[in-house]
């Protein structure tokens, strides 16, 4: 996480690294129910519900990775050394205890009985038919550029997210940072 990397970016730069890609740093869901665990989590035998690709809060840094200040410092240090920093965006699915599910039940897909629909990794699937959800996620992209000065994003499971969502997101990111990077998985 960002706390571990602070002060190590000199080593990265000295070894020719000019882009640092951080896996999800947002607050991971630790819901213990195994029906929401990925196949890899189940097979590992570790009985650990935490998975950084099962997001609980898109606007909070997971304490396991540090604080907002840690990420700010890391990005600032990386930029001073000529490196760019990109974050992983996990928008195909979220965690079962995602903070928005209770207040915005339409942010996730539901079956005919109104139950949350899980995607292929057993995590609740995001509902891109919701205009409010799209705005929430575009604002999330803007948030990390504006607050932390990140240089772009790696878009997890990008083919499963509507292309027009990514296109609009790219336009909005370029308005903030013209040389923004977006990498599709």
Question: What is the predicted function of each stretch?
Answer:
Residues 86, 152-158, 183:
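Short catalytic-loop micro-motif centered on adjacent basic/acidic residues
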